[in-house]
Amino acid sequence: MRKHLNDLYKQIEKFPKTSGCYKMYSKDNKILYIGKAKNLRSRVKNYFSKRTSHKTKILMNNVTNIEIITTNSEYEALLLECNLIKKYKPTYNIKLKDDKGYPMIRITCEKYPRIFKTRKIINDGSEYFGPYVNVKNLDLVLDLINKTFKTKKCKKKSKNPCLYFHMGQCLGVCYREDLEDEYRKEIEQIKHILNGNISKLLNDIEIKMKEVIMKENFEAAIKLKETKKSLIEISQTQIITKIDKLSEDYLYIHKTNSLNTIVILKYKDGKLTEKDIHFDESIYEEDELIEKFITQYYTSPNMIVPDKIHIFKKIDTSNITKLINELKNIKTEIIYKETKDNIKIIEMATSNAKLALITYNHEKNKAIENLKTILEMKKLPKTIEGFDIAHINGYKTVASLVTFKMGKPFKDGYRVYKINSLSNGEIDDCKAIKEVISRRYSKLINEQLKLPDLILIDGGKGQLNSAYSILKGLRIEEKIAICALAKKEEIIFLPNKNQGIKLQKRNSALQVLQNVRDEAHRRANNFNNKLHNNIKLNYTKIKGIGEQKAKKILKVLGTYKDILLLNEDEIATKMKINITMANKIKKFAEEQNLNNKQNNHI
């Protein structure tokens, strides 16, 4: 079995033994095949059997990832499969590509509603029940309804009663106008049954079965038995399809100590069409997380906001509803309702959230194993420390340290260092890297603290060699693996190797390194910007200088050191101010520069 198939098989071992749908993806993230299963783990495992067809083997050779959506029943899985195939039209799906759909029961919105089977939804106020994947079951139940209840069978009015009236299967509404109340009661009973309340009808069938068996009419008894079975099967609530002309999202958040898993189940025209999964490491409490996520998710530029957003707990959403509606110029609702259908949908979302978390952790573990192999490490890079350097034209140089554990940020391990080895205006990333690596790992050694498994430097060969020389000086180069990742080319450099490693963009090991590198870069720039803003705010301490003019001083004149290189006339000319104000700025810069030297503060 090829390596990628071995990896997939390990992923499948985590799948639940419940019903649902699975989507098979190619390396370029294209959906190749969509299927459904009563038992997801067992069904997907079958694709790895030696007895599979030649075509299936070709499919599996191209599959790099499998995503699943769990459902509450096999019926729901089948319906969802149909909807997904229609939406994505995968290469290897053929039989379900037709747009025929599954039949439903329609109760028309006429004065005397008719009840019949249909595959087409008309938005005219009619009520729909289903869809039903077993057409035979549906036909048997419809036949039972038509014989049990006296409903209208014909479309046109007549002066005389129809044949069904004479058979006792119609009240005679085709020729009488005074039966509205009586007819409404018949319809309400039918709706009651189609909503799953079948105990009375089942009891009636049991009595009827005993009667025909007593008369030795075994053929009728068999048909009644089949009808009973069909009635039980179609009474199962089909929550995959909600028959209304709305777009609705159902939001659920599964919180753990280290990670929040957010699931959005998306319904279009009453059909579940997609799920969207997000992982979040924020420290928000649940109520605040719901509010923050909804705000960010639905106000993003390309997001199509549904008619309704269902949430899993009651919170005040008036402000975020108003915000979304105003920004998007729409009218959406954010609602919480404890209806039977909503509870079942949220249960499905819960199941998918928990499963997504398992899959996420599995993928992270797989990426860490992949990284170990690529970097030829002796042990797994469970703990990675990443470094980056930032400065303002050679001033205020800082280094950031971020820590990742098992591919996830570990905020307690974040640090920022002010670089002291560079003079103001000096730009030397290699020298800055040497300082921060020396300070960091000298401290860990002296305090006998645990070393990381891997160090990542944001940069190229030069920065890597600088960091590696410090590790050698500390005699820990054999204890810690180290690499560098160049920004534009995304090439991985290793010590003592001339050629860098170029990985595919979707390679999980590269993605781990990119996440660490980008976080270190973000952290360094944020802190550097903070220092930059502090300088700007300091200028406002000069009498007569407001925030706008302070911003201009920083932009035109630069840092305190830059100002010291100018005389008062040059300052006045550049800033277009009088000589008195120029003297104040010059004097303030001299004072601040002296304070910084005394405090050893950059």
From Swiss-Prot:
SMART domains: GIYc. GO terms for cellular component: cytoplasm; excinuclease repair complex. GO terms for biological process: nucleotide-excision repair; SOS response. Residues 17-94 form the GIY-YIG domain. Belongs to the UvrC family. Interacts with UvrB in an incision complex. This is UvrABC system protein C. It comes from Borrelia recurrentis (strain A1). The lineage of its organism: Bacteria, Pseudomonadati, Spirochaetota, Spirochaetia, Spirochaetales.
